[in-house]
Design a protein with these regions (language model features):
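Local cysteine-cluster metal-coordination motifs and their immediate loop/turn environment
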Residues: 34-52, 77-95, 199-205, 231-242, ...
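Short alpha-helical segments and helix-capping/turn motifs at coil-helix boundaries
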Residues: 30-33, 91, 182-185
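Non-heme iron-sulfur electron-transfer modules
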Residues: 2-20, 45-81, 93-123
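Soluble N-terminal domains of membrane-associated systems
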Residues: 1-2, 33
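Iron-sulfur cluster-binding electron-transfer modules in prokaryotic oxidoreductases
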Residues: 101-320
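Immediate flanking context of iron-sulfur cluster ligation sites
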Residues: 24-39, 69-86, 221-231, 261, ...
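A short, structure-level motif marking secondary-structure boundaries and short turns
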Residues: 18-19, 28-29, 62, 199-201
Length: 320
């Protein structure tokens, strides 16, 4: 039976199991899932993973999954960005369906296997080191220089040759100040009913701190007690997309030390980047289901609009 009326469910990711990186077991599951995808194709309009998969099958000698070599599936895995759109909006065979298809987490397993074999490119290692890039690029003297060179055509051509970053790709600009440096003492009068700790995220700390400016102003206007979380690290989503799960764990352990005290004290933790919220709300609880601090932070974190809607529903949101 296709699909169902039940809510999609997700299972924890047993990534520390010795069989998780077993390629023979992985390939068997990969081909099982791809065979169902091949027969359905409802997801073809989503990310490039699916057209890539279907083209590989259609151009094979058998016109079936068995006509595609295991190595050719690397392209399909690389094109998945773990956005979950297929899982949440298209696939009729996700759990609790008997076929139990979780395409994004299967791709994550493939990425983890690739990373374990040291196949991650230098470019990807650099681009996913967002804390390092942010600290370097947001220095007052360096930021305008980097922004200037990123607009020069010859420099972008060189960058394309060295790091394979497309010359026409729009790169984020660095700010000459960080959100954390501006709001070292942001906390205002305590409001026991409404108190928020802002997780600035890498992007809005180093690239667009003006978003944090606006967020702080809106919250203060609504008499919300505001604090900025200090000394945090990247949420780990970029490293998750590489399959670098051990680094994800290290980042999580560091951040939990900063986050859990706010969650225990009744703060809502707000992050302005949806993928960062998703990381703490969904991915980390599935990767570390036994960690009580992860579950605690997962319940406390939300995006700004979810929090403002809470105020609106309580009749305390100022609309002026």
């Amino acid at each position: 039976m296709e699909g169902g009326l039940q809510k999609p469910t997700r299972f924890s990711i047993d990534w520390k199991n010795k069989d998780y990186l077993n390629e023979e077991i992985f390939e068997k599951e990969l081909r099982r899932v791809f065979d169902h995808c091949h027969g359905c194709r409802r997801c073809v309009s989503l990310c490039n993973s699916f057209p890539t998969l279907f083209d590989l099958i259609d151009e094979s000698k058998t016109f079936e999954v068995d006509g595609v070599t295991y190595d050719q599936f690397d392209k399909v895995i690389d094109h998945c960005y773990l956005c979950d759109l297929c899982y949440m909006t298209k696939c009729p065979y996700v759990p609790p369906h008997d076929w139990g298809i979780d395409f994004p987490h299967l791709m994550l397993r493939g990425k983890a296997i690739k990373h374990s074999k040291s196949k991650t490119s230098i470019r990807d290692k650099i681009l996913t080191s967002t804390d390092m890039l942010g600290k370097l690029g947001s220095r007052k003297i360096i930021a305008p220089i980097i922004n200037y060179f990123n607009e020069i055509k010859i420099f972008r051509i060189i960058l394309e040759k060295i790091l394979r970053i497309h010359r026409n790709a729009k790169l984020p600009k660095f700010s000459s100040y960080t959100a954390k440096s501006k709001y070292k003492n942001v906390s205002n009068e305590m409001n026991l009913d409404n108190k928020v700790a802002i997780f600035t995220t890498c992007y809005h700390n180093y690239n667009e701190p003006n978003v944090i400016d606006d967020l702080v102003k809106v919250l203060k206007h609504n008499n919300v007690h505001v604090e900025l979380i200090k000394d945090d690290k990247c949420c780990g989503m970029p490293k998750l997309e590489l399959g670098d799960l051990k680094t994800v764990e290290k980042m999580m352990q560091h951040n939990l030390l900063k986050f859990k005290k706010y969650a225990k004290d009744g703060y809502r933790i707000i992050a302005p980047v949806p993928s960062c919220v998703l990381m703490f709300k969904q991915e980390l609880p599935l990767l570390f289901p036994e960690n009580k601090d992860v579950q605690l932070v997962s319940k406390a974190i939300c995006d700004p609009f979810e929090y403002l809607l809470k105020l609106h529903n309580a009749g305390t949101l100022k609309m002026d």
